[in-house]
């Protein structure tokens, strides 16, 4: 029987005092200190898992007590999830770690139908929750002998770069449409009729990003897994599941030339995926994660309507923010282009700030507009991408064997040179 933990988060005095604090998410000027405390122990004789399947937390936001329900995201990893790095002499070293007892959760706020939450419980609580249109972030203060956490809003995080972030989406070699630098969701009756689809996503970490995180492979892995956990929540209303097939780190050197010219880098990365990655790792789509600062305001680039195409089902992402939600939105935006979505036209779409807005907004959204919904359905109808129509969704059970070089669908119509 699934055991439920009940934890209360007791609010301390609001610590203004003109001071700020440096968190993993950046420098935060306005925050509340909270102390997660477990109220109900497990029943006698019960075996406690490292990370319970379900958890409940009670805490206050703006003086209002709310109850947060969390459920482990069991479909986060593919059955053959792998992690790859390289030896000094260039040999690939691939492992298949156990991922069943992971620490990533989705959730909702009790009695609030439109609420959502995406939380990592790997080392304290880290993530965000949304209630009544307001998004709050929570993060451990990592103080010695203390369970203190900070709760804050995005607007209270100092921004090093105030320029707008944009996206570049390409439909052919010569035409580029340049996101720019700045649930518990229930399906509607219409969405319930949409086919269940699933994208197996592979993430590649280039050498610049590896160096940016001080060569800490474990930290990079947790960071990317946290972002994909949020992506999975974002795509749920489309009846589309995101599974992480693996993470590869170019820890010794880059396997392509990662240029500041995003379009050149995207072409090189897509070619590498076709000629190298697909021969050894089964995936529907791959995204390159880099710390290289792309020219202009561009922080992401992807081919449009190319999901399942062996040549062009790819995107590139600049690691432009320490806030997981912003990075997950950027990754979801570029994947949206692969799935046939255009940038939102605010004069025609029913959403002022949605996932496919051409610029990242100061109030990050996890919602697709009606235009994006229509684009996606048109893509499914017109292109008929076979790879994402899987007979059964994969689970977190990990095999010990290599998936092999299974051929992908040839009957796709995407971006052609």
Curated annotation (Swiss-Prot):
The keyword Magnesium does not apply. One of its GO terms (molecular function) is metalloendopeptidase activity. One of its GO terms (biological process) is proteolysis. Residues 398-417 are annotated as: Disordered. Its EC number is 3.4.24.-. Residues 197-392 form the Peptidase M12B domain. Binds 1 zinc ion per subunit. Residues 21-189, 393-417 form a propeptide. This protein is an alkaline zinc metalloprotease from snake venom that possesses weak hemorrhagic activity. Monomer. This is Snake venom metalloproteinase aculysin-1. The lineage of its organism: Eukaryota, Metazoa, Chordata, Craniata, Vertebrata.
